[in-house]
């Protein structure tokens, strides 16, 4: 007879790494084309003018300019306002 009971494996004790989601550039910040503005799951924030939407719903800048967040009809929208060239 065994004097020690078989040790049951612990079924907890692990955690996945955070996904680093969220707003990466805030209102009024300067961006260049390709800069990521928001990383998100689903379209919590919708793309506006001069921004693109990636297949994973990442919003990124298409032009050089300043980031602008606004709310229209209960939708958060992000735009990039271009800088007037001199």
Swiss-Prot record:
One Gene Ontology molecular-function label: structural constituent of ribosome
UniProt record similarity statement:
Belongs to the bacterial ribosomal protein bL27 family.
| Domain of life assignment | Bacteria
Q: Does the keyword Chloroplast apply?
A: no
PANTHER family per the UniProt record, alphabetical: LARGE RIBOSOMAL SUBUNIT PROTEIN BL27M, RIBOSOMAL PROTEIN L27
Segments for region (Disordered)? 1-24
* UniProt KW Ribonucleoprotein keyword: yes
Query: Which PROSITE patterns does the record cross-reference, listed alphabetically?
Result: RIBOSOMAL_L27
InterPro entries registered for this protein in UniProt: Ribosomal_bL27, Ribosomal_bL27_CS
What GO cellular-component annotations does this UniProt entry give? ribonucleoprotein complex; ribosome
A biological process (GO) of this protein is: translation
The UniProt keyword set, sorted, is:
Ribonucleoprotein, Ribosomal protein
- What protein name does the entry list? Large ribosomal subunit protein bL27
Biased composition of type Gly residues is found at 1-11
